[in-house]
From Swiss-Prot:
Entry's family note: Belongs to the universal ribosomal protein uL5 family.
Name of the protein described by the UniProt record: Large ribosomal subunit protein uL5
Keyword tRNA-binding: yes
Organism name: Bradyrhizobium diazoefficiens (strain JCM 10833 / BCRC 13528 / IAM 13628 / NBRC 14792 / USDA 110)
Keyword ATP-binding on entry: no
Entries under SUPFAM superfamilies matching the protein: RL5-like
Subunit structure: Part of the 50S ribosomal subunit; part of the 5S rRNA/L5/L18/L25 subcomplex. Contacts the 5S rRNA and the P site tRNA. Forms a bridge to the 30S subunit in the 70S ribosome.
GO terms assigned for molecular function: RNA binding; rRNA binding; structural constituent of ribosome; tRNA binding
PANTHER family xref list: 60S RIBOSOMAL PROTEIN L11-RELATED
GO biological process: translation
Gene: rplE
GO cellular component: cytosolic large ribosomal subunit
Length: 185
């Protein structure tokens, strides 16, 4: 007898409540028209890694701890003399989360990490891109519980992009609000 597959809390909530609420609000005719989360991209730019290669690897290790999935180091494509940057130098790291890991990360972001941000007054509601995707920046990655504060050499910022299948920003905002994203009024 096979055991039931694990379903993240937010995915179960989406299937049970959010999908029906969105259908009522926007009047979708088909279940496949209802917007859903597609992926979450975490990006950490490390400008200091031009001088020290290990900084990009350290950032990738910390991003791997935060995401629960291996982060890849990103390299420069062109040389820029003003930044003392040569081609193929490590300049950051990124990771793309989908399915169960994506829902788990969003759950941790909304319930644990964002309340730990200093002077947090809510997320900017104008950070949608016009196609239903939302981007936010975090100044210190140490707000995540996976990072050991004592072992961190320096606090780094990171970009988080939440990609949805929504066609408009209004639909995407309704979806993210249903997932308890704390937008400013």
């Amino acid at each position: 007898m096979a055991e039931a597959a694990y379903t993240p809390r937010l995915r179960a909530e989406y299937d049970a409540k959010i999908r029906t609420a969105m259908t009522e609000k926007f009047g979708y005719e088909n279940v496949m028209q209802v917007p859903r989360l597609d992926k979450v991209v975490l990006n950490m730019g490390v400008g200091d890694s031009v001088n020290d290669r290990k900084k990009a690897e350290t950032a990738a290790a910390e991003l791997t701890q935060i995401a629960g999935q291996k982060a890849i180091v990103t390299y420069s494509r062109i040389a820029i003399a003003t930044f003392k940057l040569r081609e193929n130098q490590p300049i950051g790291c990124k990771v793309t989360l989908r399915k169960a890991r994506m829902y788990e990360f969003i759950d941790r972001l909304v319930t644990v990490a964002l309340p730990r941000v200093r002077d947090f007054r809510g997320l900017n509601p104008k950070s949608f891109d016009g196609r239903g995707n939302y981007s936010l920046g975090i100044k210190e990655h140490i707000i995540f519980p996976e990072i050991d504060f004592d072992k961190v050499t320096e606090a780094r910022g990171m970009d988080i992009t939440v990609c949805t299948t929504a066609k408009t920003d209004e639909e995407a905002r309704a979806l993210l609000t249903a997932f308890n994203f704390p937008f400013r009024q």
